[in-house]
Structures are given as structure tokens and as C-alpha cells.
Curated annotation (Swiss-Prot):
Residues 142-325 form the Brix domain. The keyword rRNA-binding applies. GO terms for molecular function: RNA binding; rRNA primary transcript binding. This is Ribosome production factor 1. Residues 1-58, 71-105 are annotated as: Disordered. It comes from Mus musculus. Residues 303-320 are annotated as: RNA-binding. Keywords: Nucleus, Ribosome biogenesis, RNA-binding, rRNA processing, rRNA-binding. Pfam families: Brix. GO terms for cellular component: nucleolus. It is found in: Nucleus, Nucleolus. SMART domains: Brix (SM00879). Residues 87-97 have a biased composition (Basic and acidic residues).
């Protein structure tokens, strides 16, 4: 009898729930009719309450749907805020406040104590006494030897040949198993001022060694994103023999200043502007982008550029005093990722 009584009580509860559920739509309809008659619109319920978390939804399809709606709602709110701000600026006219500068990794860069001041006497003294002083004093003219690692493949060979058309008075030499320590004395004896070695891995150029002769320094770079002339879309005709102009961007620290002077010493002093050719080394976030362009003058006020190629990206790995010596060489700077790459806003060049 007790069990039967419990069942009847449970059945009564279920009946009350069904009755309440049936009455709720009727009450909502009556409330809507009342607001329509009075002319007052009901307040919209918040689509996403403050304590709501989409990640708590267990159903994957429902969770994806709610996330899409949330993104759409955010996009609408952002667009409405932009329109409102635009109207306010138009209403203020000239009195409108200046637009805020967007935050980027570059303009939020951590200040480096070694940033070079061009007017500093110490910097001027270092420039007058360093290994590149003879070049900048016009006592020597650059003469470059370009070589590769042992048994180079076609892509690396073509890159060397194209580099020799970019850098004036440069000569390509294939090593044939000769060690770098034996090549350097021969280069010095033949009055070469710089040695460029392009390394490869799996038939792809992946490294560049630049050694200034006869007393160094020697820089080792990682090379990536190599594009030869045939791989560049809408490229111009092959470069002429005119001496190109050189542009160095964003080499601001003492280390970057040294690297910039190394690149500058590869090209002669007096560019032939009639050739309209320019070689650019652009440093951005410690990546050095190399591009070779030709100016296209459309009118007296308009000018365009046409890429000639090749193009590649360099990342400095080490800077060594003196010429190349992998065993006993003294390093001025070595890139140590675990110790140096602690912040995305800290750069070394």
C-alpha cells in the first residue's frame, strides 16, 4: 500500500509540472499582448549572461553554434563602435583628437642600451679604427669571392651566379673539396676584400658565411625563403652592369651597426644612378630581408619599383673575430635561443 501511495504522489507531481508548463506559454502570450496594447516594447534578454561560458556546453554542435553567434555579436558591437566614433570625429572636424597609434611588436620594442647614437664620439672613434675603416676611407675597393659548400647542386650554383650579377666585381669559385682555411690565404694574396660562402642542405641553400678580409670579422647567417629570378612573378629584365645603390634599414644597435657596415663594404662607393638599380638589406625583428629592385619612373612625381631578384632572408647566428676559424675562433656574439629569446619584444640588431 505504501508503494502505491508513493506512486500516486509522484504521479501528482508530474501532473503539476505538466500543468505549469502548459500555463507558461499562455502567460507569455498574455504579457506580450499587454505590452503591445500599451505600446511598450519588452526588454531584450541578454544573449550571453555574464556568468555564461561556452566551453561548458558539452554538445559539440551546440557549442560551435553558440561560439559562432558570440563571434557575430562581437563583430556587430565592434562595427557599431567604429561607426559611432567616426560620426563623433566628423562632428568635431578639426578639433577631433589624433588617431591612436596601433600597438605593434616593433614600436613596443624593449629598449637596448647598445643603441647607436650617430653623434656619439665613441661611435665615431670605433668607426675610424675598425676593420672596415679602410673601405669607408676609400683606401680600398671591394673585390668579392663567392663560393659554396662541397658538391653544390643546381639551385645553389644558380644563386651564386645571380649574386655575382648583383654585387659588382664579384667572382664565383667552386671549391672542389678545398678547405676554407686554405681558401682564405689565397684570397688575401689575390687582394680579395670579402669571402661569401653559401651552404646547402638537401639541395636547398640554408646558410651564408660572410668573412671580411684580411682581419675579419666573420658572420654566420641562417638563410631561408630563397627565390631565384625565374621563381619571382612579374620580375623585370636581367640587371645591367651598373653599380647599384645600397639601402640599409633598421640596424640600430652596436651589433646591428657592425653587420650593416659588413653589408655596405660589399658594394663600391659611387653608385651609378643611371642604372636605377638598388639593393636593400631591411632588418625587421632580427630578420634581414634582401631585395634587388629597379626604379621605374612613371612621371616627375610618381615612381614605382620592379623586382629583379634574387631574394632571400637572413638570420644572424654568430659574429666571430678574425677570419673563419671554427675551432679556435673568438666569438663576439652567439645567438642562444633559450637565454636570449625570452621576450618577443626584444631584438639584437
Amino acid at each position: 500500500m505504501a508503494k502505491a501511495g508513493e506512486k500516486s504522489v509522484g504521479g501528482g507531481k508530474r501532473g503539476l509540472k505538466r500543468k505549469a508548463a502548459a500555463e507558461e506559454p499562455q502567460e507569455a502570450a498574455a504579457a506580450s499582448d499587454g505590452t503591445a496594447e500599451s505600446g511598450v516594447q519588452p526588454a531584450k534578454a541578454a544573449a550571453f549572461p555574464p556568468g555564461f561560458s561556452i566551453s561548458e556546453i558539452k554538445n559539440k554542435q551546440r557549442r560551435h553554434l553558440m561560439f559562432t553567434r558570440w563571434k557575430q555579436q562581437q563583430r556587430k558591437e565592434k562595427l557599431a563602435a567604429k561607426k559611432k566614433l567616426k560620426k563623433e570625429r566628423e562632428a568635431l572636424g578639426d578639433k577631433a583628437p589624433p588617431k591612436p597609434v596601433p600597438k605593434t611588436i616593433d614600436n613596443q620594442r624593449v629598449y637596448d642600451e647598445t643603441t647607436v647614437d650617430p653623434n656619439d664620439e665613441e661611435v665615431a672613434y670605433d668607426e675610424a679604427t675598425d676593420e672596415f675603416a679602410s673601405y669607408f676611407n676609400r683606401q680600398t675597393s671591394p673585390k668579392i669571392l663567392i663560393t659554396t659548400s662541397d658538391r653544390p647542386h643546381g639551385r645553389t650554383v644558380r644563386l651564386c651566379e645571380q649574386l655575382s650579377t648583383v654585387i659588382p666585381d664579384s667572382h664565383v669559385y667552386y671549391r672542389r673539396g678545398l678547405a676554407l682555411k686554405k681558401i682564405i690565404p689565397q684570397c688575401i694574396a689575390r687582394d680579395f676584400t670579402d669571402l661569401i660562402v653559401i651552404n646547402e642542405d638537401r639541395k636547398t641553400p640554408n646558410g651564408l658565411i660572410l668573412s671580411h678580409l684580411p682581419n675579419g670579422p666573420t658572420a654566420h647567417f641562417k638563410m631561408s625563403s630563397v627565390r631565384l629570378r625565374k621563381e619571382i612573378k612579374r620580375r623585370g629584365k636581367d640587371p645591367t652592369e651598373h653599380v647599384p645603390e645600397i639601402i640599409l634599414n633598421n640596424f640600430t644597435t652596436r651589433l646591428g651597426h657592425s653587420i650593416g657596415r659588413m653589408f655596405a663594404s660589399l658594394f663600391p662607393h659611387n653608385p651609378q644612378f643611371i642604372g636605377r638599380q638598388v639593393a636593400t638589406f631591411h632588418n625587421q625583428r632580427d630578420y634581414i630581408f634582401f631585395r634587388f629592385h629597379r626604379y621605374i619612373f612613371k612621371s616627375e612625381k610618381k615612381v614605382g619599383i620592379q623586382e629583379l631578384g634574387p631574394r632571400f632572408t637572413l638570420k644572424l647566428r654568430s659574429l666571430q673575430k678574425g677570419t673563419f676559424d671554427s675551432k679556435y675562433g673568438e666569438y663576439e656574439w652567439v645567438h642562444k635561443p633559450r637565454e636570449m629569446d625570452t621576450s618577443r619584444r626584444k631584438f639584437h640588431l
